[in-house]
Every structure is written in structure tokens, then in C-alpha cells.
Amino acid sequence: MQHFKVVDNQAYIGGTHNTRPVMMAFSFFDHTTKVLPGLYANHIEISSIEVDPARREVHVLVHTQKRGCQFSVRSYSYDAKPLRTLDFGGEDHNLISGKLLTVNDDELMLIGNYSTDCTPYSQGIYVTRIAHGETGPADADRIQYVEFSALQNFFKYLKPKQQQKMQAKLDKLKQENRDTKFRYRLLVHDPILTEEGLLLVAEVYYPQYRGTAMPNAVNLPRVGPAAVDRYFDTFRYTHAIVCGFDRQGNLLWDNCLPIQDLDSAELTEMVQVSQQDDKLVMAYPHKGEIKTEVIQKNRTVRETETFSLKVGTNDKQKITDSENENLLAWYGHYFLACGFQKIVDDPRQGFNPREVFYVNKLTYSLTEKPTDDKAGRSGK
């Protein structure tokens, strides 16, 4: 299961079966299940599902890897009947992912990342407005594209000298009228409605693979000096970008959160954002700690800070390992942190760690300087 949404008494569940996408509607009332038609096919990926409680509609955003890498918004009724399809296709830009956000009674905004070569590697982000009930081929002229190189703070995750070299490279390419496109994998979050328009957060990542050199064995063919078996290891996150748009889809500002040595076995949203007045608190879990940074549009108000997750009520207890760490921006200035920890009650009495599952309620208030005392405590 990869997608889950609820409207009234019905849940919409999306996943894959035999490498093909499947979307089902499950009724909590009579416990019946219906399959949404038109999705179980080869070369189709479900980008996201969005629900419209007011109209009792479900929008399934899909990406087709063939036929010009078409992207479409397929709308269904509450009882899983197809209503309409809005297609996005183009020779120069291929939409990879998309998120919908209702801006008023008549319009939605579609935002996500795009590529220029029909691959998972994106060259930037896009935003467009669509009308409720719009169908058929979408108007490509309404889509606004923003290349990564056009973002002022996209490369802020690099060290100062590396940033200078990157900027010099960009300036040289522009002077020579050469291509300034960059290719990154992007995990796009749900957009957030603001007074100005909308807020988009996305995390830049890449998959890591490990290679195992297998020595020659008896009766096995020799291919080169050794056979190498590459297998997936983890996803490595490098930085997160945050962009502010007005209600017409124009980029107003951008910022960047550097991410330090963060790996995850599953591709999930690690960076969480809490809105506090006109500032944003950006945070992510990292090896039993929480790292934060506070921004105000394109300015950094507080540099990276690190807070420890305390263990129980015994100060002698020590965390020896943390796994499956998750952080959630809850409400107001509160976060929730959970995961598994291995702790030692008193290292002086021997090393005998025990594993606990913890749920912490964390507070980050901009009205005062945060301290480690605000970190929550682990629950058993």
C-alpha cells in the first residue's frame, strides 16, 4: 500500500499488484470493495491521490512511461465511477509527479517536478492552474516551469567554496548560451496553502547501491577478474528546497535546508515544516537527534541546531542505537517523534541494551531560545 485517503465513509487505497497500479475504494459502511477502472495497466505509475470532500470526488494523478511520458489527472466519483481525464503532454517537458491544491471554489493548482528527457531525473519544478471539471488535453501554455538553476538558494547545501565554483560554472554557461539544466531526483510534499498563495517543500535524494565482488568458484564462468553484484542499499537525502508561490503560480522566493548524512531504507518524507507566524521551522530526525533550521522566506533566521531525544526519567540511561526514526509536524509549535531505540539503563553496571519504541511530543517555540530541555522523553 502506497496511497491512502478517506472521504466520509469511504477509504481509497492505492498500491501495486504484479507491478501494475491498483486503486480500490473500501466502504466502512458495508465493507465492500470496488476497483477504480482504467488504472491496472503496464507502464503506469500512480503519483498521488487527492480528494475533494466538498464535491466528493477523487483525483488520481498518474504518470505514463510510454506514449511520450504522459501525465494525467483522472477524476472519479465517490462510488469509484470515472468522471473525466485531464492530460498533460509535451515534447519539451514531461511532468513526473503532481500534487493538487484547491485555491477557491472554481480552481485548483497543480504543482510538482518535471523532466525534459522522460526519466525520473527532474530539471525543475512546475506549477499551473486548472479549472474544476476541466477535461481533455491541458493548455500547455499555462504551465510555468522553474529550472533548479533559477532558484537562488538551491545550491546552499554545498560548502561555500563549492557554491562559488557552482555559481562560476553557471555564469560561464549562461554567457556561452549553453544548457544550464541539472538532473536530480525529487520527493515532492503536499503543497501548503498560504496567504500569498502556496508553499512547496521537496527533498532531493539519490539511491545508494552496494557492490559485492564475488570470487571465482568452481564450474562458474569467469567474467573479468570478478563478478560484481550490485544491490540497492538506502536512499541518501542531500537537501530540501522550499518555494513560495503566489496564487497565479509565480515564484516569489526560495530557500534550502542542507541535510547531513541522512539515509533511509524507504523513500519517505523526512523533513517536516511547522509554520509559526511569518517563519518556518524545518526539522528532520538524525541518529537519535532532531536537527532544525528556521527560515523567513529566502532568509535563514536560525542556523542549524541539534537537540537530543531524552531517554525516560533516568539521567544515567544512554541511547546506543536508533532505528526507523520518524518526525511529524503536528500542530502549532509541536512535533511528534517516534521510532526504536536501544538503551542502556546504567553503562557503569554493564552493557546490556534493551529495545524500546518511543513516541515524543516536542516543542519548538520561536518566542524564546530553544534548549535541550524541550526535547521529549521516550515512552516504552
Language-model features and meaning:
Residues 1-8, 48-54, 99-105, 182-196, ...:
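Structural signature of eukaryotic scaffold interfaces centered on beta-propeller domains
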Residues 9-13, 55-60, 106-110, 196-200, ...:
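Entry beta-strands of beta-propeller and related beta-repeat scaffolds
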Residues 23-30, 70-81, 122-135, 223-249, ...:
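Beta-propeller blade signature
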Residues 53-56, 68-196:
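Long, internal scaffold/assembly segments composed of regular secondary structure
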Residues 63, 111-125, 203-236, 342-353:
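Short, conserved, GDST-rich strand-edge loop motifs in beta-rich repeat architectures
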Residues 86-98, 142-161, 174-182, 255-272, ...:
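Conserved blade-ending motifs and adjacent loop-strand segments that build the rim/top face
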Residues 188-209, 213, 218-227, 231-239, ...:
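Loop/turn-rich, solvent-exposed surfaces of beta-rich toroidal or solenoidal domains
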Residues 328-377:
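Blade-level signature of beta-propeller repeat domains, shared across WD40, Kelch, NHL, RCC1
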